[in-house]
Swiss-Prot record:
UniProt superkingdom: Eukaryota
GO cellular component, as recorded: chloroplast thylakoid membrane
Matches recorded under InterPro entries: NADH_Q_OxRdtase_chain4 (IPR022997), NADH_Q_OxRdtase_chainM/4 (IPR010227), NADH_UbQ_OxRdtase (IPR003918), ND/Mrp_TM (IPR001750)
Entry's Gene Ontology BP terms: aerobic respiration; ATP synthesis coupled electron transport; electron transport coupled proton transport
Name of the gene encoding the protein in the UniProt record: ndhD
GO molecular function, one term: NADH dehydrogenase (ubiquinone) activity
Species of the source: Glycine max (Soybean)
Subcellular location: Plastid, Chloroplast thylakoid membrane
Protein name: NAD(P)H-quinone oxidoreductase chain 4, chloroplastic
UniProt similarity note: Belongs to the complex I subunit 4 family.
The keyword Hydrolase belongs to this UniProt entry's keyword annotation: no
Amino acid sequence: MNYFPWLTTVVILPIVGGSLIFLFPHKGNKVIKWYTICICLIDLLITSYVFCYHFELDDPLIQLTENYKWINFFDFYWSFGIDGLSLGPILLTGFITTLATLAAQPVTRESKLFYFLMLAMYSGQIGTFSSQDILLFFIMWEFELIPVYLLLSMWGGKKRLYSATKFILYTAGSSVFLLLGILGMSFYSSNEPTLNFESLTNQSYPVALEIIFYIGFLIAFAVKSPIIPLHTWLPDTHGEAHYSTCMLLAGILLKMGAYGLVRINMEFLSRAHSIFSPWLILLGSIQIIYAASTSLGQRNLKKRIAYSSVSHMGFLLLGIGSISDTGLNGAILQIISHGFIGAALFFLAGTSYDRLRLLYLDEMGGMAIPMPKIFTVFTILSMASLALPGMSGFVAELIVLLGIITSQKYLLITKILITFVTAIGMILTPIYSLSMLRQMFYGYKLFNTPNSYFFDSGPRELFISISILIPVISIGIYPDFIFSFSADKVEAILSNFL
C-alpha cells in the first residue's frame, strides 16, 4: 500500500504555491504568469502519475484514501479518495486550469491577485471532487466560491459587479439547502455525526425524509449545473467575465453540480432518485429545447455560447434520470466532453473580442478572410458542440439517448416522446451554431472600429485551441478510455436501484 499523501499534495499545492506569488516583485507579470503555469503543470503531472501508476481501473471502490483526524469534537476528518466517478473531473480540472492560466496572458491589472485566485479556485475544485467526508465536501464547495466571485467582480465587462453579485446570491443561497441536507443526513441516526461517504452510502432513511434531503441537494446542485429555472445567473456571468474565467466556469464549475447529483443524490438517496428520475427526464428534455431556442435569439456571442451550455447540460439530466448503465456512462462522458468544448468556445470568443472589441453578432462579419486560423478552429469546435460524428459531443449524446431507449424504467411510448423532443433540440443546435458562424465569419465586413486589430491566431492561442481539440477528437474516436474508469463505478451505483 502506498502511504504517500498524493491527494493532499494535489489539493494543497496550488493554493500554497499561489500564496508565494505575493513575494514576487511588483513588476513581473511574465514571471508570475509562467510561475503559475508551472504550478498547474506540476499538479497536473502529479495527478497523471497517480492515475497511471497507483489507480486500478477495475476497482469500483474508493482508492488512494487519506484519513486524518482534523477536529476531535465531532469526528471530522481530512478525508480524500478517488474512484471512477471523480477521476475524470479531477484530470479535466488540471488540464483546463493549466490552459486557462496560459489564456490569461492579456491580464496585467492586479496580476498577482488574479493568478493567486485561479490557483485557489483550482485547489477548491480538486478538493470538492476528491473529498470523502461530506462536511469537507461542503467546505471545499464553499471555499471555491470566494475566488470565483473575486475573479468575476474585478476583471471583466462593465456590468461585472452586477453579474458577480447575481452569481454569489444564487450560489450562496443554494448552499443553505446543501448545508441543511448535510446536517440532516449526518445527525439522523445518532447524536454522533456520520460524515464519511462510505457510511452515508449504507445509511437508510424514511422515504419522506429522504425526499426532503433529495430536494435540498437537488436545489443546490441545480444552481451550479445549471438546471432551469435556476440558470439565469450563467448567461450574465459569462457575458461579463474575462474569457479565462469563462473557461474555468464552463469547463469545471458547471461539472461540480453534475458531479454532486451523481455522488450524493444518486449514490446516497437512491429511493428518492427513483421517484424523481421521471421529473429529471422531463426537465432535461425541456431544458434542451428551451436553452437551444433561447440561444438562437441571443445577439451577444458569449451569451449564445452560455445558453448552448445550458442546453447541453440537459443531456446530463437525461443520463442521470435514465437509471441505466448506458445512460449514466453517457452522462459522465458528457461531463468530460462539454468541459473541453465549452472551455474552448469561450476561449475562442475571447480571442475574437481581443481583436475586435465587439461581442454583438450583428456587428461582426467577414472575419474568415483576415483570421483564417481562428475561423478554422472555431468552426471545428462548433461542429463538436453540435455533436458532429467523430467528436466527443456526438458520442456522449448518442450514448445518453441509447441509455433512455434501453432503460427498463420507462414505457415504450415515453421513450419515443423523450427521443422525439430531444431530437428537436438536436436540430436547433446546428441552427444556432451555424448561424453564429455565419454572422461572425461570412458575408461583408460590418465592423469598422478604430480599436480593431486584424491579426490571426498566434502560437499561444493555436497551442491552447489544438490542446483542447485533440482530446475532443480522441474521445470521439475512442470513448472507451473514459468508460474504462467509469464503468465499474457506474455498476456499483446502479446496484443500489436493484
